[in-house]
Each structure stands twice: as structure tokens, then as C-alpha cells.
Amino acid sequence: MKILENVNLSEILWYKIGGTARYVLQVENAQDLEKAIDFIKKEKLKRAFFLGYGSNLIFTDGSFDGAVIQFIAPEKSSVSLIRDNTVEAFAGESLDSVIKFAFDNSLVGLEWAGGLPGTVGAAIRGNVGAFGGEIQDVVKEVVIAEITNSKIVLKTLRRFELKFGYRTSLIKKRRNLVVVSVQFRLTPTDAKGIQSARQAYLNNTEYRKRRHPLEFPNCGSVFKNISDPEEVKKILETYPDLEEKIKRDWHGKVSMGYLIKRLELAGFRVGNAQISPKHCNFIVNLGGATQKDVLTIIRTIQGKFREAFDFTPEVEVEIVQ
């Protein structure tokens, strides 16, 4: 475990937003995690927050008087093949490293995630998805740490026990649970299948480069796409022309990026945070943006939705105060 003191979180988090944390504890394995919990207990810290890259977080601008436990990739990769079609990885490994390892071992099933930032642990916690795929589709089991009264107990949960939902899971709902490692059940294929999967991965990665504002720090999709049938109905009452697009292109949901643009909010700016004209469900950091700037934009979008559709869209990002 590596201990860092008085860390400017804007220098280590994906979004480049955040105040100063009293400690950052970097962990590379389950043993490091146990040491981190012991450290928190020894120092009598009252706050702790677990993260990977922080690619889906908006952290407070103020000081964080506690410990940020950051899962990082081990110096020696933990990604391994434990059975013919099962790949295991520590929570701090990048999701991309697992995809590439799978390809090298003639396994497919994760290519839809090409170009997604973030760690394995964060992917499980938020049940990440794209292009019709979700991480829950390929999870076999997860080793989690249950932390209670500064004690840590490791447990193995099977896929159905994780209670996956749209961009959520049991781990996200219960703040004392942390992903330690994951087993993915993937699909064996031949050389032609791998070639096809690699091409899908490249296509998805290129799509992100073209359509997402990767030239600026961002936290990915700020809002969940609209999936609730009643909310979809309200949108169709206002925009009946979207019915075919919802069925054909959006997998039954309604794209938040499209709706924000249609509400004429593209390019809306507060301080150094801006709704990206490139993809309106992204709020980019133009340089020196604050959490306050971003939250003001989020509330503006939610206000416009209440006026137009009589409901408030749900944020996908996690906001840490």
C-alpha cells in the first residue's frame, strides 16, 4: 500500500476536479485493502471513499478530511485465465486490459466496451454498458469486501446475487461493499471470431473518438438515458417523431444527449464547465472547472426537463460532497 498525504485530487482524478484529500491510499491487492482499513482505524479517520480512476465522479471542491482509497493496477498484471473461458482480474485493472487479454486468449464478449475508461471494479459497481451490451452479461462471480466497524470480510457473490440493474448494482446501493476481484465468463471463438470482435472493438473506440469530447476532461455520461416507460411516454407526447428511433437505435431507451440538444442547451456554460456541443450528455472541464460549476449545469438541465416533460432525469455520475 502506498500512502500519499495532502493530495490535490484534481491532479489524480479523471475529471480534473476536486479539492485536497488528507490521505490517498493506493491499493494493488486484497492485502493492501486490509492495510488501508487498518490505517483508517489507526488514524481514527471518519471519512473514507473508494475509487478507481474516478472517471464517473464529481468530487467536492473543498477539503476531504479522510482517506481516499484508490484501486490501481498491480505492477505485475493480475489478469489471468483460470479456466478455458474464465478470466479473473483485480478491481484496479483497467477494463481495457481485460478486453485485450481476452482477445489474446481467443475469448469474446467484452468488445462492446472498447474505449470505455475506468477500472474493473467501477465497471461492476455501475454495471457499465454501451452499444446494447452490459457488464452483467459476462460476470460469473465477484469477490467483494464487506466493511463493518473498520473490519473487513471477503465474500464471493455470484452474478444473480449482485442485483444488477440499469447502471447500478448491489455494490453501488450498499456503501460498505467494495469490489476486490472479478471473474468474467467469456465465449471461446476461432480466428475469424476474434478478427470480428477486434473490429467491433476498434469501431466502438473510433466511434467514441468521433462522437465524444475526449479532448477535454469529462466524467462520461452525466445522466442515465430515459428507460422508465412512463417517462418515455411523456417524451413521446412532446416528441412523437422519436418513436421509431427509440425502437431502432436506442434499444428502447431515449438518448439524454439528444434530448439535451433538442432543448437547445448545447454549449451552455457555467464558469469553465460546458455542455459539450459534440455530445450533450457530457459536461466537459475546459480548464479549472469546479464541482459547483458542473452542479449548476446539472440543475439547469433538470429544471428544463421538469418544464418540458414534468419529470427529473436521474444522474449517472456520482457526486461526492
List each model region and its residues:
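Anion-binding (especially nucleotide phosphate/pyrophosphate-binding) glycine-rich loop
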Residues: 1-131, 138, 147-148
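A structural signal for short hydrophobic beta-strand segments in well-ordered beta-sheet cores
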Residues: 77-82, 144, 223, 317
